[in-house]
Amino acid sequence: MRWWTATLAAAICVLAAGCVSTGNAETTTPTQTLIPRPLVERELDSLLLSPEEVNVAMGTTGMAVTDSQSAFADNSATMSPLECLAIDGAAEAAVYANSGYRAKRDESLNNGDDFTHYLKQAVVLFPTVEMAGAFFDASAQQWPTCRAYTHTQSGSQWTVGRISNASATLSTVAPQQDARAPGWGCGRALALRNNVIVDINTCSADPADSASKIAGQIADDVTSRW
């Protein structure tokens, strides 16, 4: 009957307020690392900035959506050399070919008849964080190979500025040579967060860090989604 005596003693110990252990065992709480879940396709549209947010980021007014796409553009035949296509514009088909991406959303915006500001904002979904990271790493190797390029239809020439790679974001500015006053240039930014690539192209007389700023806002939104 010893098993019954032991069971009864244990039950009494649980019920009694004064029953304590005098052992020296320490209780440890396991540390868990929270890993963000991969984003899914239905979330992509909500990542893009509103026209009002774009106005603030680009320091202008009147920005409005002129085009929305879920397929990639292909401007590979209108610029040279081809290795500069990734810097010339965001979300290009030839750039993402064979990358394994799953889905994409993009919007183009400008400020109407004035057309002093332009934005193309794109978010590209990959099946895994690793695949998105591989695309970013390949881009980080490829971007510096471009120094200058030409739009073959218009004959306009562009010079690529210093390329920054910091905090999982590539960025640069490419001014158009011999542009009419007050000038024209385009900013580029490519950011990696979770299983999403944020791909931004901004153009104005002085794009400065507008592409990086917009990419950062969208990237922060990606990071906040658990």
Please annotate each region the language model reported:
Residues M1-A11:
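N-terminal export and membrane-targeting signals
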Residues S99-D137:
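A short acidic-to-branched-hydrophobic micro-motif
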Residues N201-W226:
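Surface-exposed amphipathic alpha-helical segments
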Residues L15-G18:
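C-terminal motif of bacterial Sec signal peptides marking the signal peptidase cleavage site
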Residues Y118-K120, P182-R188:
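Short, surface-exposed coil-to-beta transition loops
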